[in-house]
């Protein structure tokens, strides 16, 4: 290990971070009335995603769907149970209530991600069709119709986006 493989992993992480940051920048540009700047941020974000995906392919880290589901489940479960709980404790110790809210809601959403992966692993062969609804405030995912209010952040169902 080392050398090239580490460089590929670093490239993947860097590209993923850049893509997300640019998507958020695009949202801000839209809010401020700069649609062409938003488009530029989005197109570069897409390009960064391509770079990150290529690094994953070179690393041979894209496996079968069943293996990808199992890995994703383990990752989400670990993040929810370990990382976010530690982040909450640190934010509480620092007295940063905005960070406490962010970390605790993110932890709760990560737990729902793990449940969705677990359910998908149990029903892989069925390949059932569903519409997911994602809370645009905290990221909670409803499997089916959106709830009247998000169970994590409390926002109304009008803030949910459908994914068909």
Segments predicted by a language model, with ranges:
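Non-heme di-metal
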Residues: 1-164
């Amino acid at each position: 290990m080392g050398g090239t493989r580490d460089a590929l992993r670093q490239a993947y992480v860097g590209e993923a971070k850049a893509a997300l940051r640019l998507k958020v920048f695009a949202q801000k540009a839209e809010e401020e009335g700069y649609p062409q700047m938003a488009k530029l941020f989005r197109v570069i974000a897409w390009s960064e995603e391509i770079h990150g995906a290529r690094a994953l392919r070179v690393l041979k880290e894209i496996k079968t769907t069943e293996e990808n589901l199992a890995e994703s489940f383990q990752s989400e479960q670990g993040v929810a149970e370990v990382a976010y709980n530690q982040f909450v404790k640190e934010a509480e110790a620092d007295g940063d209530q905005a960070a406490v809210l962010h970390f605790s809601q993110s932890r709760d959403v990560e737990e729902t991600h793990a449940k969705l992966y677990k359910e998908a692993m149990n029903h892989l062969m069925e390949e059932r069709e569903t519409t997911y609804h994602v809370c645009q405030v905290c990221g909670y995912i409803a499997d089916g119709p959106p709830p009247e209010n998000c169970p994590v952040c409390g926002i109304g169902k009008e803030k949910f986006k459908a994914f068909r």
